């Protein structure tokens, strides 16, 4: 499939959490010092689902929200953005998750979460829309849904059903250490489902965390390889990404843009990649085409860093193509 704005037909189902990010109106201050906050919908799997539709693809979200104003607002945002919402459940007893995000002057973030428990943690296997999951050509997920039961059991069931139905499994661990009981538990659970994934994307920081090495090199990345993996990606921020397949590996350069907020950049990158490969997985075996797709994905990620919040900043295909052509 050419790298253009053409709509893909295969369904990408994204599983996990959706929440409200409260982002300070001023960068470079602590949460206590922030004069105010901008309310921004977020949650990595939901960001990916919207990134896909923004680029002309077809996506659905599976997860649980609070039966509260924020939860219904988030469901409305998914629908407004063309994401199929038949996989959403609402919990009457728990609130929608909130995250307060500290923005450093360089746009990097620190998080403080309010989920004790939040609705997303309470999704059960019985609440899953299995028909929707079976219809996925790509099933995408993170690791936050592995932290506690019953959501962990729902995650495992959904993954198993998608795999049995022939979906490509896409995994972005999206490490958020403050949510885990310990770093050791985070590493153990993130690795517990490692060998099921066909495509894995980690950031350079996550690579260091998972390998225990401070080197971002091929040897370190390949220590995460497993025999059934089709593509391993290590994102490097504005430097682009490294890619690894069974037959080849290399680097795709990034884009220099004025970074305001890095929230959602990785999700935008993943959404772009999945939109391009959902109908033609042979791209994963053709280095020239894969590099073209990854360059497009890097452009999408870069654009997402130029605005505050994730979902408002996710680009259209034409915006990404403008940056690719050097017009931005």
UniProtKB/Swiss-Prot annotation:
It catalyses: D-fructose + ATP = D-fructose 6-phosphate + ADP + H(+). Its EC number is 2.7.1.4. InterPro entries: Carboh/pur_kinase_PfkB_CS (IPR002173), PfkB_Carbo_kinase (IPR050306), PfkB_dom (IPR011611), Ribo/fructo_kinase (IPR002139), Ribokinase-like (IPR029056). SUPFAM superfamilies: Ribokinase-like (SSF53613). Pathway: Glycan biosynthesis; starch biosynthesis. One of its GO terms (molecular function) is fructokinase activity. Keywords: ATP-binding, Carbohydrate metabolism, Kinase, Nucleotide-binding, Transferase. One of its GO terms (biological process) is starch biosynthetic process. GO terms for cellular component: cytosol. Signal peptide: none annotated. Transmembrane segments: none annotated. Belongs to the carbohydrate kinase PfkB family. May play an important role in maintaining the flux of carbon towards starch formation. This is Fructokinase-2. The gene is FRK2.
